[in-house]
Amino acid sequence: MEPAVRGVAGVLVPVAFFAAGAAVGGRAGVAIASVWVAIAGLYCLANFWHCRETHCAVTGPGWTLAAVLGFAAALAPGTALSWYRVNVETMVFVVILAAGYGLEYVVAARTGRRAMGQAGQHAQDC
């Protein structure tokens, strides 16, 4: 899974999911976009638990909650969540991404480390 969320693939895969969701549109489109947001969120939750990367403290729960809201919008009857569509989910994804990496930048500037916690407390393979 990791190659799909890092590097060039980490840009192309979300773009593909969001583009597919936008092409389909409506409830199905937001469900498609929410699949990627859920994958990214759950990956970041696991990564934070394992490696303690600072941005994952924000992106993990943020994206997971955004995906839950996306699936709720796709499944909810009526128009209560009709405002939450692919364009909104994409903006939420980018804002959470910026907040996570912004926090990581601040932590790294202050501590010299991208990971939270004491030096050496995270896994060797991170």
Model-derived features with residue positions:
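C-terminal ends of transmembrane helices
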Residues: 42-53, 104-109
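Structural signature of hydrophobic alpha-helical transmembrane segments
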Residues: 26-38, 86-94
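Cytoplasmic-side transmembrane-helix entry/capping segments in multi-pass membrane proteins
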Residues: 54-65
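Membrane-helix boundary connector in multi-pass membrane proteins
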Residues: 69-91
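Juxtamembrane "helix-exit" motif on the non-cytosolic side of transmembrane helices
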Residues: 20-24, 47, 72-80
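Membrane-water interface at the C-terminal end of transmembrane alpha helices
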Residues: 74, 95-120
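Alpha-helical transmembrane segments and their membrane-interface exit regions
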Residues: 36-46, 95-102
